[in-house]
Amino acid sequence: MKQPNINLAACILWLLSIITAVAAETDAERNTGVFARNSAARNRSPGNEPPGYATRFKGVTWDVANWRLTTTELDQGHYQSRGSVANGYLGINVAAVGPFFELDIPVSGDVINGWPVFSRRQTFATISDFYSFQRSINATNFPWLDKYGGDLISGVPHWSGLILDLGDGNFLDATVKNSTISNFSSTLDMKGGILTWQYTWSPEKHNGTYDIFYQLVAHKLHVNQALVRLEITPSRDGNVSVVNVIDGYSAVRTDFKGSGQDGSAIYTSVNPEGISNVTAFIYAELSGTEGVDLSSSSLVDDKPYIHMNGSTIAQSVNVKLRAGQTTKIDKFVGAASTDGFKNPRQAAKEASARALRTGYEESLKSHIAEWATVFPSDSTEDYTIPGKKWLPLDHHIIEASIVSVVNPYYLLQSTVSNNALAAVKNAPLNRGSIAVGGLTSDSYGGLVFWDADIWMQPGLVVAFPEASQIFSNYRVDKYGQALRNAQTQHLSSKNDTYFSPDAAVYPWTSGRFANCTATGPCFDYQYHLNGDIGMQIVNNWVTTGDTEHFKSKLFPVYNSIATFFSQLVEKNGTKWTVTNMTDPDEYANLVDGGGYTMPLIATTLKYANQFREMFGIGANQTWNEIAQNVQVSRDQASQITLEYTTMNGSTQVKQADIVLNTFPLHYTEDYTHDNALRDLDYYAAKQSPNGPAMTYAIFSIVANEVSPSGCSAYTYGQYSFSPYVRAPFFQFSEQLMDDWSINGGTHPAYPFLTGNGGANQVAVFGYLGLRLIPDGILHLNPNLPPQIPHLRYRTFYWHGWPLEASANYTQTTIQRATNRRPLTSADPKYASAPITVHVGPANNITVYSLPPSGQLVIPNRQIGSISTVPGNLVQCQPVFSPNEFAPGQFPISAVDGAASTKWQPRRASSTSSLTVTLPDHASSATISGFAFDWAQAPPVSAKVVLHDEPLHPVTDPENGDASGSSPTTPASSVTVWESAKVPLSDPYDPIKIDLNMIMSYKGNTTNVTLPSTVPATKFATLLIRGNQALGPVEVRAGNGTGATVAEWSIVRSS
């Protein structure tokens, strides 16, 4: 072990680099449309913070101080543009124009949601755990298990509709004509958990206009309640109706129970299909200001906006409007189901009535206060400049700031707070885990996958350990069924394998029952889920420090999973393996010796013995022997870890698999950083563009840990969210492209909280290098990419103690959080004792001590300053391209020091350009040449231009990109290299190349040595055209994607 050594020279160099970056940033800003739209933010001064930062999405701005996303673009009938609210118990998805039910408008003839239901896309509402029982499901993994049935989430009637009806066929609902809406804006307020709309409605053939304001909340403290407000300000007097609609169209997979009036309220009720002893009730009641005649209330059913469904009910009231005066109508919703309340009708009725008595403003106030408690300002990463609260004018950082808030926000919407539980006398409301689409979508049937345990939980539990109990509570609740599942091996290839009564196995998908089903088999499929649950359990203990809970509730589950694994494995020579299984890469099913599953089994058995000894049970020596001898296959020539024993080089990978061994598994048994780096580079090249939105978060974290140079972790970090988020509210889609006809046939899940969960891990586990290892040591390995000037990390918990950390490029400062109390479960031994901190890889640890008070300063690794290509002047420097690029193939990829990331323009048929800003310290340097790595798709032609003035005018993405245009060239620019036909260093030869061979990454490269050195300039631009990887047909049609640039280095003369 080495002791820390602060290098003064390195600190001075860092300071110079920051000054350089700030100076260079001004030039880089001039060359991007997003920066151009943020031009008003340039004139910043203390107390003059900009109200909002423009994003790349037209009309969408980000208010970083108040955590608000606002859009002025109205996009109706498309699932991507709809907002949602949820509180952990109730969830609802609503139309883009207001809190209405909405059916999707077909896009390219498609309105279908994905596997396994393949139902029509529309707005959705549900209640936590409201699962149905289905005799069969439209699509499955193992159809022969269909005879045992399965469960899918059921909807509840869509409860938020308030329709303004003018009569004569003029009404305001989701189908209102876009042309009648002006001054539109809609805002998602994530500090308050509020969704609002504001616009002017000018109905056709109607002499008058109406200023409209809608507001929607699902109460975070009183989770049986929801609130809707409608404000109407007319241009003329008039009599109208406002209709309180509870729309049964969203109550999918339910049986109608009953509906009607109950006093001044209306209600409806449904059972989930196949579950007759569970009922959900929805109550709704109105109040209003002067002009709202509540005594006129009557049921209506003959309106075009009232869908004819058994569980639909609507109530109309007369409203007298006065010109220029605002009339308010408030809707108070109560909801409950048998799963959480013994008398759901009474619970729903009382919730609605209580909200009405409390009043809208007071109810809203308590809701906002609870969100502030649940989601404090220090619980997300803060990218603002210290002391100024400004974001750097860099669109990458602006979007990173947005997702640092939306990621935990969307996950927290599916959790119930401790205060909320207390308010319902600890009803069992926080035990359902989080489905792929949360509570606002029935994507993936509303089922729970590994997504919850390994993608959503880790980044959430470190900052919100109490809310995150929902993950472990679910697995504990289903533990009894998991024990029974292990005894169903006779339905699988393991029919001759003995599993003891204390062995437990969880199904791949689960809902109400967690039994083995056709969508969620327990055997012959993704056994790794069980080890993922084990990791989730360890994360829970390391963050909360609740050893008693761990011992009594969580360890029994962990021990039973270990027992199952120990009986599942088979001896193969001297090694242990698992046959007929699937690793996380679902493109390879029913294989042997999964390259992630086997290390996961070894780690689970190792930790299980550690915990057994800790609790006085004694280690199982057979488990130790298995753990030390699991089969992990590796190609001998390339040293690439294989996903399965028969894998060959033709493999294309669906999602993160082998790279999971480095993180989150932290597997190091005969697995070095060199192995991890080889695997990362290899599998990054094998990653399918049609894979789901979470893989690149792991790539970022692993790259930050094992890369010896460059800043590819930053590139991968951008890739983890940028291509997947959608306007206006930065919700994740499962896919890079939503059109199933071009994305490999996937109807993407939306919202895809798995993507949020993955991206939510990048900063804390990547840049900070936090590892949740159950050894009583705080493990960190900080390395902040040079593109980020400063980062304050989320407050995170370790053994129940809140810690805060912040970083610049050279160092990270960590201390006990001064504004947070420890959890009640916090390990008391750290109350007055220091925390031991290990920094660095296991074979090169530096030991620190974090005192109970005071700070610990840790030097960052600063790998961005280590040149992959010696003498490279532009590694990790600001870049800009005016051209559209293939999804995720960012311009920054070309200079991040890693060949595994690539810039790829969208079109090969036109000239595309990439401009890099050279650092100020290069102003006196001379350039001797260039090094290019073109990966597998070199351009036909290329040239490099040096210049001191911007080569391109500002190009606004809102008005189209500059593809196909000829770049303007300043008179002072110099073309220093040009090739009309870029030579191939590694041309594809189908006779010599065996596609089945597993080979480490090798790209086509071009090394250029200039005839004589040339002075460095402020900018250098690479222009490329064509793509030598395209076939003749694509070239003639002119519709192929552009060439790839994996790395462009500008080499300084020695």
Curated annotation (Swiss-Prot):
Subcellular location field: Secreted; Secreted, Cell wall
Enzyme Commission number, as recorded: 3.2.1.28
Keywords: Cell wall, Glycoprotein, Glycosidase, Hydrolase, Secreted, Signal, Virulence
Name under which the protein is recorded: Cell wall acid trehalase ARB_03719
Top EC category: hydrolase
Amino acid composition bias (Low complexity), ranges on this chain: 962-974
GO terms for biological process, alphabetical: trehalose catabolic process
Taxonomic path: Eukaryota, Fungi, Dikarya, Ascomycota, Pezizomycotina
Transmembrane feature ranges: none
Residue sites binding substrate per the record: W450, D451, K654, Q655
Matching InterPro entries: 6-hairpin_glycosidase_sf (IPR008928), 6hp_glycosidase-like_sf (IPR012341), Gal_mutarotase_sf_dom (IPR011013), Glyco_hydro_65_C (IPR005194), Glyco_hydro_65_M (IPR005195), Glyco_hydro_65_N (IPR005196), Glyco_hydro_65_N_sf (IPR037018)
Signal peptide span: 1-24
Spans annotated as Disordered: 950-974
Pfam families per UniProt: Glyco_hydro_65C, Glyco_hydro_65m, Glyco_hydro_65N
Lineage top rank: taxon: Eukaryota
